[in-house]
Amino acid sequence: NVIMVSFASQKNGRDYELNFVPEFSKYGFTSTLFKSEMAQLQSEGKKVILSIGGATYPTMLDSLEEKEVFVSSIGDLLEEWSFDGIDIDLEGKSLKFNNFKIDSFGDHRLTFMIEGIKEIMADYYIKNGKKLLLTMAPETHYVQGGMSENLVPNKHGGAYLPMIEALKDSIDMLNVQLYNSGAMPGLDSNYYNQSTPDFILALTEAVIQGFTAANDLGTFSGLPASKVGVGLPSCKGWGYTEPKVLEATMKYLLGQGPQPGEYKL
């Protein structure tokens, strides 16, 4: 019931001003038809969310002025296209914060990003009288990677944690990308490989329970299970999990089946 539209792109080559310019002509679409189909989905109770970031469009706010442009440009897109929310999918260059901490941020660019998201949500509520949906789709490196002494802080491991912690009351769903990942630690300090029940269970439990991050990064308090999704690819690739394995894993995660691997909840 939630449709993600990817991605908002850079406007004028600036990484803090965003635009939405789909290549409609490639697919026989027009902006009018796109908006009409969005409206139809919304009339059926579905939500359509604009995804921001991705590997192709890094976003970094280096100054107060850039934050203001960022907030304004996204607000304009929400109004023009009638999206129900935003998905924060920052990757790579967008997360190269320096000397950050979970509770005190540290890097002014991280502070601007958190403040900017809060302002976007506040402005949307004032204009529309309802909450803007907020989801996030970080890579494992920037969440559970916060438990790795090797990744924190020299490789920006855990860089998403300050944002998740600061915005936890506003986040509607966190979908960590449990794919395209190297081995990652669980709460038991053991490392698990993707495409396995243990990987899915260990990394999902860490997000729900919270953890003390490595190298004095701070404490991540976790999110309610109702706000935690399991982000997996539906086609074969790096991190693909066979359907039968996934079904058994999810049943155990939900308390409806036996333990499918070595990791015990």
Where are these regions (language model features)?
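Chitinase-like catalytic core of GlcNAc-active glycosidases
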Residues: 1-207, 213-214, 221-247, 260
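C-terminal subregion of chymotrypsin/trypsin-like serine protease catalytic domains
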Residues: 259-265
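Short glycine-rich, acidic/polar surface loops and turns
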Residues: 249-253
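Extended serine/threonine-enriched, polar tracts that run as long, contiguous segments within proteins
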Residues: 212, 254-256
